Amino acid sequence: MSTKRVLCKFFMHGACLKGEYCEFSHDWNDQPNNVCTFYQKGSCSYGSRCRYDHVKVSRNPTVAPPPSSSTTTRASSSLQPLSFGRPHHVGYQADSSNPRQQISMDVLAHSGSKPVWRNDFQHESVLEDGIDWSISPTVQNQTTLSPADLPICSFAAGGNCPYGEECPQMHGDLCTTCGKMCLHPYRPDEREEHTKLCEKNHKRLESLKRSQEIECSVCLDRVLSKPTAAERKFGLLSECDHPFCISCIRNWRNNSPTSGMDVNSALRACPICRKLSYYVIPSVLWYFSKEEKLEIIDNYKAKLKSIDCKYFDFGTGTCPFGSSCFYKHAYRDGRLEEVILRHLDADDGSTVIAKNIRLSDFLSRLHL
């Protein structure tokens, strides 16, 4: 069969980029070929969600000789689409072994007032001649398909379908967050997943818009208007709510302390309110509530927890941060480091957590 008489599978889903130059047909009256080639090989990863037909196609092992002009005429007459004997009320005979094709043809032939894709996915049980086709189990099995297995129209999901109510593809429901018709009517899990993801992206976009006006408390520039991408980040302090750009707060904390200067009170404290913060969290967003700040900090720690610590070095090195390190302490066999804290009781009754104690620390304090 010529490719010009085979309906383009990309055109069926509204995604053909070749237009009039496509070698396949863009006429809905032509026969489609929606057999999944991956299913024939037994390796379709989409399963029931695949938009193509999962049917076994029998192959003739013998190779036919090149057809002549006379045999071509006989072959074309013998390759007419099959029908299972239903009355020709549609005006097109579809392949009975292709249930999705039967659905598409009936959807195209429907001329009711409601949208075509809103019709049921079965033929009418009683036709004009009074024959009840619903009593035939063979016909019913061949024409019944779960609506959840059908894809939605990509044109409608993108915002505008040129076919409107006459579109042969199913139209999705409206997502109130993104404003697109992209919610599948018969896939509740997929709808819920899209809604959560869409709300999360919308919330992030709103936070990004509000963060555009935040200025650094040191250089007084808008943080997200810095010239380079590396500078367009906030440096969040764990115990303070003053905004800083990441470069300014890091330069402040990396200054070498003078003799006799307390590092905690001089460098690790906020330049404005002097509150002590032991670490800085880089972020492209600024928070506007305590919950948002905790979410940013938790996401940052979770990301670092998946990165191996360069000081621990899979157990061959020593991390100076100990149990306070945000990075992963794991051995080469995948085992995580078992943290055992040593508690020391002081004379005043307080308890402190001891770090690694070495003999050289005591010997260095002796004046012999």
Curated annotation (Swiss-Prot):
A UniProt-annotated Pfam family: zf-CCCH_4
EC number: 2.3.2.27
Region annotation (Disordered) ranges: 58-81
UniProt xrefs under InterPro entries: MKRN-like, Znf-CCCH_4, Znf_C3HC4_RING-type, Znf_CCCH, Znf_CCCH_sf, Znf_RING, Znf_RING/FYVE/PHD, Znf_RING_CS
Domain of life: Eukaryota
PROSITE patterns: ZF_C3H1, ZF_RING_1, ZF_RING_2
Zinc finger extent (RING-type): 216-274
GO biological process: protein polyubiquitination; protein ubiquitination
Low complexity composition-biased segments: 69-78
Catalytically driven reaction(s): S-ubiquitinyl-[E2 ubiquitin-conjugating enzyme]-L-cysteine + [acceptor protein]-L-lysine = [E2 ubiquitin-conjugating enzyme]-L-cysteine + N(6)-ubiquitinyl-[acceptor protein]-L-lysine
Tissues expressed in: Expressed in primary roots and leaves. Detected in vascular bundle tissues.
Pathway: Protein modification; protein ubiquitination
Keywords for this protein: DNA-binding, Metal-binding, Repeat, Transferase, Ubl conjugation pathway, Zinc, Zinc-finger
Zinc finger residue ranges, C3H1-type: 2-29, 30-57, 147-174, 303-332
Function: E3 ubiquitin ligase catalyzing the covalent attachment of ubiquitin moieties onto substrate proteins.
Name of the molecule in the record: E3 ubiquitin-protein ligase makorin
